[in-house]
Amino acid sequence: MTRKLKAAIIGSGNIGTDLMIKILRHGKNIEMGAMVGIDPHSDGLARASRMGVATTHEGVEGLTRMPGFAEIDFVFDATSAGAHVKNDAFLRSLKPGIRMIDLTPAAIGPYCIPVVNGDMHLDAPNVNMVTCGGQATIPMVAAVSRVAKVHYGEIIASIASKSAGPGTRANIDEFTETTSKAIEVVGGATKGKAIIIMNPAEPPLIMRDTVYTLSALADEAAIAASVEQMAAAVQSYVPGYRLKQQVQFDRIDTPIRIPGVGNALTGLKTSIFLEVEGAAHYLPAYAGNLDIMTSAGLRTAEHMAERMLATLAVAA
């Protein structure tokens, strides 16, 4: 039987519960060890118990008191940015080598977008999965950036209000700050900006994302091809990720001002329109924001675990 490494999930809300179901159904190198929450009556903890997963409603302290804590190699944190900083410090004081997959905007570890820089951080003790909007859009900024110098990248993530739990709502400022910075660090833009919209429409609308870049003039066909290749790469772990329409281009000949970038910018404006349909593992298919975040987190952990297991096999 193939050995798997055990993971705990902190946060029994929408993201944590969706991730748990993914691991139970599709985990290759990772298996569930514990589901951790703070509300004894949460649906996530109840569902975990029904699915045979060990649970605690006593937070990270409760996790460390569980009989199986010694076997936990990975911890996915789906709480909030502020809580993650404390969780990482507390758990690392007890298990210095534990791997943390940060699903909050805390970003105390390097930003990780699997299709862009995932292989760069396989040995990192803590990686940050940016945000749902970042996972959807930063690959597109990077796709333009590998063809032309991107001066400015702006993304707008529109998600169904019903898909946003209390953790997401409490982290709006952190969402915009972390995503904006990751557009620069991972996407390659000189300046990044992020906007999130929670759409209260009924019935809930599917996640949609818009990406605008202003770059140096370049071959439009090459940029379009790069975008399509990147979209296909994301689809390998988020099947519901797709381009909504063809990439659009506008040449900016009249100099424009972009604060923080320059006062006389010209070049090529690229507009990319995306749609992310969820796999409906927990919330319905409109919650593509959950799906892309948990899928990216699991993809990253799977690659880390594969590397760790290979090292153990060689040592044996």
UniProtKB/Swiss-Prot annotation:
A GO MF label: NAD binding
Gene Ontology BP, a term: catabolic process
EC number: 1.2.1.10
Superkingdom, natural source: Bacteria
InterPro entries xref list: Acetaldehyde_dehydrogenase (IPR003361), Acetylaldehyde_DH_C (IPR015426), NAD(P)-bd_dom_sf (IPR036291), Semialdehyde_DH_NAD-bd (IPR000534)
Active-site residues per Swiss-Prot or TrEMBL entry: C132 (acyl-thioester intermediate)
Binding site for NAD(+): S12, G13, N14, I15, S163, A164, G165, P166, G167, T168, R169, A170, N171, N289
Keyword list, A-Z: Aromatic hydrocarbons catabolism, NAD, Oxidoreductase
Entry similarity comment: Belongs to the acetaldehyde dehydrogenase family.
Protein name listed in UniProt: Acetaldehyde dehydrogenase 3
Upper classification of the organism: Bacteria, Pseudomonadati, Pseudomonadota, Betaproteobacteria, Burkholderiales
